[in-house]
A protein has these predicted regions:
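A detector for small-residue-rich transmembrane helices and their helix-helix packing motifs
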Residues: 1-196
Length: 196
């Protein structure tokens, strides 16, 4: 919902430039210590198709994860995946890169689903889910070759974070422990950015 509000503000008010300067992941500013910029790009989207795709993916992927693990772990995986995606975009991207969007967070949700599919691969449902998720991931892997300025590093980082968090969640049913896992993963992303 916040992303939609910020999209309206950037598209229909004179605040676009100010909000992008304040919240976009500008790697040169991350290098100067503005580590929070690995989180804040999830509030910004560069165009109607960008936000529509991300909000559609959130709507499709999110509710079952939230029902399965609880609201706070879901919020945690979303933010932790955004942070790891941002850290990947910082570490593997160019110092001149500027990134906006929630794709790292969305790919974290793909990562959780991929983990669930891999864990259930010996069932018919798991095999079908694995094929569906695999197809969507292959399609998304091709996008950077077709559409310029896609932060594939953020996609990859988010996917890995979501998969790892999903694996760690499978080891506990305790909601507080699941939240702690997401905080630890986000903390590692921040520490990586601060160290490098």
């Amino acid at each position: 919902m916040l992303a939609v509000i910020f999209f309206v503000l950037t598209q229909f008010t004179g605040m676009r430039e100010d909000l992008f300067l304040a919240l976009a992941q500008i790697n040169a500013l991350v290098a100067e210590g503005e580590w929070w910029r690995i989180f804040t790009p999830i509030l910004l989207h560069d165009g109607i198709m960008h936000i529509l795709f991300n909000m559609w993916a959130l709507w499709v992927l999110g509710p079952q994860i939230e029902r399965g693990v609880g609201t706070w772990p879901f919020v945690g995986v979303y933010l932790a995946s955004a942070a790891v995606g941002g850290a990947f975009a910082y570490v593997f991207g160019s110092p001149q890169d500027v990134a906006v969007g929630a794709s790292g967070a969305i790919f974290g949700l793909f990562g959780v689903w991929l983990n669930w599919a891999v864990r259930r691969r010996n069932t018919v449902q798991g095999q079908m889910l694995l094929r569906q998720i695999g197809f969507l991931l292959l399609l998304n892997a091709a996008l950077p070759f077709l559409i310029p300025n896609i932060a594939w590093e953020a996609h990859l980082g988010g996917l890995i974070a979501g998969f790892v968090i999903g694996e760690m969640w499978s080891r506990t049913k305790d909601e507080r422990a699941r939240v702690a896992v997401t905080i630890a993963v986000a903390g590692l992303a921040v520490a990586t950015v601060l160290i490098l």
